Amino acid sequence: EMSFPGFDAAVNAVQAGQADAIMAGMTKTKERENVFTMSDTYYDTKVVIATTKSHKISQYDQLKGKTVGVKNGTAAQRFLESIKDKYGFSIKTFDTGDLMNNSLSAGSIDAMMDDKPVIEYAINQGQDLHIEMDGEAVGSFAFGVKKGSKYEHLVTEFNQALAKMKQDGSLDKIIKKWTASSSSAVPTTTTLAGLKAIPVKAKYIIASDSSFAPFVFQNSSNQFTGIDMDLIKAIAKDQGFEIEITTPGFDAAISAVQAGQADGIIA
């Protein structure tokens, strides 16, 4: 079963015990591994500055005196915090990508930073966005559950199915469906392909973001879809368990797993 509260809310949902796991384009970091048991990675990402087409920015120096939007709790926020004093800009945080995009369109922020494939997807969908810079490599996405929870076995099950998908090409197929790239840069670090776990319970609550296309977003039929949704559904099918997806937002998803309100996070 799935819910889509947004990245911030998805994190909080896992921390609060309202979701079992989180999957929403969550970058694997040492800090997060202190709180979450995280899977092998499935996608390398970059974060990049985006503006409207009429206000292009090609270097960080041009951000002086401006306001840059970013989503709460993300790798992009951490990067901006590390350079804001050097380049003299301020940061405004948002719970969802939709709110951030709307603020950029309305002119209440001058630029925003998000994952490069997310911005590229939005541009291809006709949104008034533009990128001039190459972006900053900040890590790779992974699935996570609360460290020490009784559902840590979900990470083992995820890794087993992910290894199989890396070997048979089905992971690349999912990623290429939604982007122009592939997962080929992500190392296959597990040798568990072909194994199958015995689920501890019939259905797990997985927390995710709510608007993070092409990883998770609502389509024209009001159904949540994207890379993360295709991936977690394929893994659940391979491992023989059911999932309920919640989408509280990235930060809330992390909090939900940490609080035991969710079993895992893919965000």
Where are these regions (language model features)?
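Bilobed "Venus flytrap"/periplasmic-binding protein-like clamshell domains
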Residues: E1, M26-T27, D44-G97, N101, ...
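Extended ligand-binding regions for polar small-molecule ligands
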Residues: E1, S54-I57, T67, N72-A75, ...
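Extracytoplasmic small-molecule ligand-binding "clamshell" domains
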Residues: E1-G25, T93, V200-A267
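Stable alpha-helical elements in mature extracytoplasmic
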Residues: G6-A10, Q18, I22, Q59, ...
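Hydrophobic residues within well-ordered alpha-helices
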Residues: V14-Q15, L63, S103-S105, F143, ...
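A ligand-binding cleft/hinge motif common to bilobed small-molecule-binding domains
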Residues: M23-V35, R78-K84, S103-V138, D251-S255, ...
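Periplasmic-binding protein-like
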Residues: Y42-T51, K116, E120, N124-Q160, ...
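Ligand-binding clefts/hinges and TM-proximal coupling segments of bilobed small-molecule sensing domains
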Residues: A75-K92, G126-M133, Q160-V200
